[in-house]
Every structure is written in structure tokens, then in C-alpha cells.
Amino acid sequence: MKLTYHGQSTVTIETNGHHIVIDPFFSGNDQAMTKPEDVKADFILLTHAHADHMLDAEDIAKATGATIVATHELATYLSFKGLNVHPMNLGGQFEFPFGKVKMTQAFHSSSIIDEKKQTITYMGMPAGFLLTIEDKVIYHAGDTALFGDMALYGAHYDIDLAFLPIGDNYTMGPDDALVAADMLQAKTVVPVHYDTFDLIKQDAAAFCANLEAQGQTGQALKIDESIEL
């Protein structure tokens, strides 16, 4: 299985002929090296509705026929656009052709902002994902603050790889992410959601060094760099 980081919180997964995209944000990210029209997708997993996590979801889904997996409200909204969707909600699990997806809680918000109309439409709760693929467990926290129930995930799942936001301001920062990593006890932690904008500039190398200091492994992936599980 190959997992590739594309900047912000965007991750693609290739496994047994299946292509999964988490939080596609390519066209709006100046640092992105991949164009949305070049993305292969069978399933698109959305943690929430903010533009920096789903900006390219509609275009990719239309081009590929991919099924979008999201919370009930967000999935229903996207179904009105004629897209294939699979609605879920917090705590629910479903087995897809590529593996199991469990939707986890996240402490954040979820909305679609139309600046032209000056409207904000809330889209249900934000989420994270616990994926079980090829007997490996991957946790994508989405956008979230630190919360104590992360310890439950660490206790009940043998997490091989965790994608944790470190940008601060909108999500937990490096210090809280270190606490999260300790609770999750993932074998490897990859920082995400940083450096895309000035408000979330962080030193990912320093974060990984601090992970090492607390006995854990961190890996700050470059844009379009992959990791094999």
C-alpha cells in the first residue's frame, strides 16, 4: 500500500488496484504539485466541508465517478449535485471494497462559505477516519483540537500510521499534537495541515524531533512524497 502526501491535509492511498483520496485540496494550494485532473479516485473521503479539504472533490468525483464518503449532511448536499455518495456518521463503520472505514469524532467545525452571497451553510459535524486496509490501521484526524478520547483509539486500535494536524490557530498545534501522538501510540506520525498559509506556519522537523524525544517516530513528508505500509 502506498500513501502519498499532497500538502495541507490531502492524502492519496493506492491499495490492491483501488485509489482513495482524503480531503482533496489541489487547485487552491500553491504548494501542490499534482493537478486535480491527474488524480485517480475510486473513493473520496471528506473529513468536513471547509474548502481547504474538499475544494476539488466535486470535479474529481465527476471526472472519475468516485464515491464520496462523508457525514450524512455533507454527503446528502453533494448528492444533490448528482455525485455518487456514501453517507456515514460519527462512530459508524462500513466495509468498502478497499477496506474498513470508521468515522471518528473531531473537534472543529464544518461549513460551506459562499463569499459572493455572503452565506455560511453548516454541514453537520466534522470527522476523522480510522482506516483498516491490508491489515494496517491508518488514522486521519481531519481538522481537530486535542481531545481525550484519542486515548481510546490508541487503546483499542494498533495504529500503524497517524496523520495529525499541527498548524495551530485553526487546529491543535505542535504541543497538543505531541500529546495526541502519545495517546494514540501510532507507530509513525505524519504531521499535516501546516505551512499552506501564514497563519499555520510550523516547523515540522522540530515536531518530529520532539516525537523522537518522547520515544515515537515522526516523518515529515515533502509534497508528493510517499510512504509504504
UniProtKB/Swiss-Prot annotation:
Family matches, as Pfam families: Lactamase_B_2
UniProtKB keywords: Hydrolase
Any GO molecular function: hydrolase activity
InterPro entries per UniProt: Metallo-B-lactamas, RibonucZ/Hydroxyglut_hydro, UPF0173, UPF0173_UPF0282_UlaG_hydrolase
Protein family per UniProt: Belongs to the UPF0173 family.
Record-given protein name: UPF0173 metal-dependent hydrolase Exig_1934
Organism: Exiguobacterium sibiricum (strain DSM 17290 / CCUG 55495 / CIP 109462 / JCM 13490 / 255-15)
